[in-house]
Amino acid sequence: YLRHGLDGEYDILGVPYVDYECDVERGRHLILYGHNMGVGESERFSSLQNYKDPDYYTRHPVIRLDTLYGSALYKVVAVYALTARTADADYFPFNTYVDFADDEAEQAYLDEVARRAFYTTGDYVRPDERLLTLCFCTYEMEDARMLVMARPLREGERAEADEVHIQPDPQLPARWPEEG
């Protein structure tokens, strides 16, 4: 999937794929990985890099996910960055949270994401809602990942941006470059 298309032919952009531990049909947390090659706005996950900017979120608060099982709209709730190096002291194994033992475990995970987020959207995730996390490379440092977390658009809810809460001091990877 990393360097081949659905037809099996070589494709530098690969194909987005689901974490192997996720239950695609019934799981509580669906994690998708894709390339951000910076090639163009429409190239796989490249445009997701724009979510680092809260103004982009206000213009694009909803993500559409199309699968073999159907289509769904998800509302962005947080955007954060991680190191992919498991040896780094501040490594956060977000991909091990594909299901939650109980509501408290899920809340602990959401609190950890909020501590790391560039911003949160003033929205919240209900205990019965599925999470969607889109994970892709970002190039502020070597082996960095950006993550966009969303929850389903609720019945009757408008696809509009919620208020943005900029995190003044998010917990970024130690190797993350200083701004300005």
What are these regions (language model features)?
Residues 1-180:
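Solvent-exposed, non-transmembrane regions of membrane-associated and secreted proteins
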